[in-house]
């Protein structure tokens, strides 16, 4: 576990804040490279995944016990386990040794708005239809980036399935805020565009030394 990243998240923790991470894992690097046309310098994006901070629970662990909401596809060969879709996870899941970048972003929300945001994330997480993570939609967004069609609905959009950045944006939309100011369709939301959004009033970044 990357203790530096865990400390970074713990220092800037608040329910409903947005977290971005960028890993050197080959699969995640492909996602970062696929967002190159969206970055200001044309280089690969720093980030491959986005999620929301949830609650801090006294669960007896010594790692801060921070929980997050995310949409992800997680396959564990060692545990013979597949987790697909919107889920609640512990933030240590993303405190990886191969992490190169991390960020925490926040809006100036009232306590009522912050509570409503977490409640919306909980609603999606435990929705009886079980919202899944759409691998096809990921490729649809990469296609939209290349073809300049981000403002169009994702060509592989699936009902009851959302990408990580789309999930984060939907939670904010659910409380009357949109964190993306451009014309990008919700189904094509990317971690890179979230990172560039001017709406955030709180911003802290971490970079691997």
Where are the regions that the model predicts?
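Cysteine-nucleophile amide-bond enzymes
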Residues: 1-209
């Amino acid at each position: 576990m990357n203790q530096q990243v865990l400390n970074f998240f713990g220092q800037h923790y608040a329910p409903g804040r947005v977290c971005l991470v960028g890993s050197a894992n080959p699969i995640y690097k492909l996602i970062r490279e696929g967002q190159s046309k969206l970055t200001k310098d044309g280089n690969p994006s720093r980030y491959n995944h986005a999620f929301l901070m949830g609650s801090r629970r006294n669960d007896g662990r010594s790692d801060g016990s921070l929980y997050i909401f995310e949409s992800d596809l997680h396959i564990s060969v060692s545990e013979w386990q597949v987790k697909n879709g919107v889920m609640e996870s512990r933030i240590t899941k993303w405190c990886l040794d191969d992490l190169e970048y991390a960020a925490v972003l926040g809006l100036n929300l009232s306590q009522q708005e912050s509570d409503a945001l977490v409640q919306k994330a909980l609603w999606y997480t435990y929705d009886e239809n079980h919202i899944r993570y759409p691998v096809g939609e990921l490729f649809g967004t990469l296609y939209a980036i290349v073809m300049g069609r981000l403002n169009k609905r994702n060509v592989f959009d699936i009902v009851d399935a959302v990408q990580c950045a789309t999930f984060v944006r939907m939670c904010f939309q659910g409380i009357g805020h949109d964190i993306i100011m451009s014309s990008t369709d919700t189904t094509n939301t990317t971690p890179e565009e979230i990172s560039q959004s001017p709406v955030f009033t709180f911003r802290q970044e971490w970079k691997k030394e």
